């Protein structure tokens, strides 16, 4: 078996790298690390994991309101969920779905929204995770 230590990075395709970098730093709360010289990729830090925004020339086909399918979830600090929700609203972000899910693998209140290209994102106050070491 391979000993995986964690997620090194994940990437999200975007139509406008500079515009998306502003969204992911100002709205989502990521920290800018680097931009490639040609401006086609931006590297962001998400609490120790690298998120790469990658320029796509072909149309990106989002799945609207797909909160149960492909999406990217960002854990907010415990007790900061209400402030994160207000932060989204203050930036004019439309909330597509909100719930407090309990009794599953990933538990806690969560909210779903879209980035500028329609990628589904989630903020969650992760109160428990079934995969946590005992």
Question: Model segments located where?
Answer:
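Conserved beta-strand in the GNAT
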Residues: 52-54, 121-122
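N-terminal beta-strand motif that seeds the catalytic metal site of vicinal oxygen chelate
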Residues: 1-18, 72, 127-134
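A generic structural signal for short beta-strands and their flanking turns/coil linkers
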Residues: 8, 40, 49, 68-70, ...
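Vicinal oxygen chelate
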Residues: 3, 6-15, 45, 62-87, 91-134
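Core segments of cupin and vicinal oxygen chelate
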Residues: 13-52
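A short local loop/turn or secondary-structure capping micro-motif enriched for an aromatic residue
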Residues: 53, 59-63, 92, 129-132
């Amino acid at each position: 078996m391979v000993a995986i230590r964690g997620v090194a990075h994940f990437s999200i395709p975007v139509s406008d790298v500079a515009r998306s970098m502003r969204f992911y730093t100002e709205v989502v709360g990521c920290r800018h690390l680097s931009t490639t010289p040609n401006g086609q990729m931006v590297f962001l830090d998400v609490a120790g994991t690298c998120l790469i925004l990658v320029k796509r020339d072909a149309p990106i086909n989002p799945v609207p309101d797909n909160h149960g399918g492909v999406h990217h979830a960002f854990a907010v600090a415990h007790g900061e969920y209400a402030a994160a929700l207000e932060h989204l609203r203050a930036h004019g972000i439309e909330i597509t779905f909100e719930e407090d899910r309990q009794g599953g693998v990933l538990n806690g209140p969560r909210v779903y929204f879209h980035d500028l290209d329609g990628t589904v994102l989630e903020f969650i106050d992760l109160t428990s995770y079934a995969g946590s070491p005992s």
